[in-house]
Amino acid sequence: METNIVEVENFVQQSEERRGSAFTQEVKRYLERYPNTQYVDVLLTDLNGCFRGKRIPVSSLKKLEKGCYFPASVFAMDILGNVVEEAGLGQEMGEPDRTCVPVLGSLTPSAADPEFIGQMLLTMVDEDGAPFDVEPRNVLNRLWQQLRQRGLFPVVAVELEFYLLDRQRDAEGYLQPPCAPGTDDRNTQSQVYSVDNLNHFADVLNDIDELAQLQLIPADGAVAEASPGQFEINLYHTDNVLEACDDALALKRLVRLMAEKHKMHATFMAKPYEEHAGSGMHIHISMQNNRGENVLSDAEGEDSPLLKKMLAGMIDLMPSSMALLAPNVNSYRRFQPGMYVPTQASWGHNNRTVALRIPCGDRHNHRVEYRVAGADANPYLVMAAIFAGILHGLDNELPLQEEVEGNGLEQEGLPFPIRQSDALGEFIENDHLRRYLGERFCHVYHACKNDELLQFERLITETEIEWMLKNA
């Protein structure tokens, strides 16, 4: 198997000898540390950021060295796991299998049962041995490599917001916050940064933290967020972009499983409550040269010309990237005034009302916080949209709009599409995105999300019946 790019030590692109040796050593070390392991979940990540895979007996793990097979159509599934034939990866191709190989370094205990079950990521390769170009992880890797080839090395961190929910709906059938464990005290107030809220849910939050450490997820602990039952967990910054997204998805799975253990639900749905803030996925990004120096500021700590190019590119592609940043119908309910979320493409310093925020810090920590994506988005694709914007800014002479000062929600800016249908239209029509992300990926993603939208629009809701039954 030939390698396409040698700069990034990507597991798929190593020689078979080196890969086999590294895999064998990883399995050996893991089983020495976790000798009671009986099964291993081998996992691919689909377009929606959902894990697809199977559970194999630990005796079969070493056979994974040369890969296993999954259908290519796993990357043409809707949110419910149904293959979307319009994407062209299913029956039209004869439902072909493709080889999937382990991602080196991803073998960890599973949050489902860490003593007896492990988990390992897979990545798909095409018939010619190249990375399968529709897999979100491979889409991101290709863009990451392009930046590295230009001598630019991103350092990123992911922040994720989520809600803990009661398993029981309220009297009207709506979602509701959980009671504090062991009490009948249901928090209905917004208490951002409340330590008391952390204490009330210490058992589940501590379990999340302990399992994150066991899985080597570099999490920074939980913060009580703006709404009842809402929390945020931040991941430490890293220069391994793929691992940052691997960890974000592993964390989402872990949080859900730990909530179930404590008789609650956890959701990363963008907007579970009409009256409360939604949940976002914020990405912090800085850029280094090959000497490890931050190149987003000059010697005086001011914004560098490179940063301004990056900002211009990210802003220009942001509206067309909304289909990736807000991937579901519910995602667009999050973009409302007064809900701590930007509603147009904008930038500014130390300003949480803009889409691209440059936080406080010295020149060594100069970075951008990309504040648009929902927690329901696929982190590989959010990061890919960001990198596409950065490359777009580097490749073209784009004007940078004026910095926003004050409340960016009340000022003129480049608006986002506010409906999924509009976002999908802008996405598929953007030549720059198709070039950076790949024609086939864009076709498959658009087909799958458009099919989901059509399914949703065929549904007849209780609200429609209530409004129209006697009034139409």
Swiss-Prot record:
The organism's taxonomic lineage, starting at the top: Bacteria, Pseudomonadati, Pseudomonadota, Gammaproteobacteria, Enterobacterales
Nucleotide-binding among keywords: yes
Enzyme Commission designation: 6.3.1.11
GO biological process: glutamine biosynthetic process; polyamine catabolic process; putrescine catabolic process
Gene: puuA
Protein name per its UniProtKB record: Gamma-glutamylputrescine synthetase PuuA
pH-linked activity: Optimum pH is 9.
Source organism: Escherichia coli (strain K12)
Subunit details: Dodecamer.
Requisite cofactors: Mg(2+); Mn(2+)
Task performed by this protein: Involved in the breakdown of putrescine. Catalyzes the ATP-dependent gamma-glutamylation of putrescine, producing gamma-L-glutamylputrescine. Absolutely essential to utilize putrescine as both nitrogen and carbon sources and to decrease the toxicity of putrescine, which can lead to inhibition of cell growth and protein synthesis. In vitro is also able to use several diamines, and spermidine and spermine, instead of putrescine, but with a much lower activity, and cannot catalyze the gamma-glutamylation of ornithine or GABA.
